Amino acid sequence: MASLFKKKTVDDVIKEQNRELRGTQRAIIRDRAALEKQEKQLELEIKKMAKIGNKEACRVLAKQLVHLRKQKTRTFAVSSKVTSMSTQTKVMNSQMKMAGAMSTTAKTMQAVNKKMDPQKTLQTMQNFQKENMKMEMTEEMINDTLDDIFDGSDDEEESQDIVNQVLDEIGIEISGKMAKAPSAARSLPSASTSKATISDEEIERQLKALGVD
């Protein structure tokens, strides 16, 4: 019983209108078919009266045929109007649905805007940016400290490499001679004296090889 008193929605009203329009269209088509049938009968009657020479009957039947054809033409006009109304109803239904969707979207946006505090959102973004900058600065400081720690040993190794390269360029293989030098464990002259002697001899040998007395 509750469904009987339920308020009709827009869709329900449009569906009823479409059903009525379709019923009207079918009725118009039936009427046109009946008129076409009468038209053929009148044409046959006119031909029959013409054969027997009954001019008066031909004239009366011809007037009836003219009126009938006018009525048939009207059915086409009405049918076209009904089709137009059906199309217009569908367009209106589509527009109303779009309007409903837009209304729902507007309400959703309004609710979101009420929940969202622009000032609070801006503050949150600023805090994020500030903390991100702190993190980047901390990371940079840690990297600089690590570079300072490891760069010291690298500098020492690099300095030793430069010294060896210079000695190699003037023909002194100090590393090789150092390997052949007597160790401090043996009862021989001190390491500093051996190094100096080896270095002098090596220099003299290199000079002689170059042809310098």
From Swiss-Prot:
Residue ranges the record marks as coiled coil: 25-55
Membrane topology qualifier: Peripheral membrane protein
Listed GO CC annotations: amphisome membrane; autophagosome membrane; cytosol; ESCRT III complex; glutamatergic synapse; kinetochore; kinetochore microtubule; lysosomal membrane
Any one of the GO BP annotations: regulation of modification of postsynaptic structure
Matching Gene3D superfamilies: 6.10.140.1230
Motif annotated as MIT-interacting motif, chain positions: 201-211
Single GO MF descriptor: protein domain specific binding
Biased composition (Low complexity): 179-194
Pfam families to which the protein is assigned, alphabetical: Snf7
Principal location: cytoplasm
Subunit text: Probable core component of the endosomal sorting required for transport complex III (ESCRT-III). ESCRT-III components are thought to multimerize to form a flat lattice on the perimeter membrane of the endosome. Several assembly forms of ESCRT-III may exist that interact and act sequentially. Interacts with CHMP2A. Interacts with VPS4A. Interacts with VPS4B; the interaction is direct.
Family: Belongs to the SNF7 family.
PANTHER family to which the protein is assigned, alphabetical: CHARGED MULTIVESICULAR BODY PROTEIN
The protein's name: Charged multivesicular body protein 2b
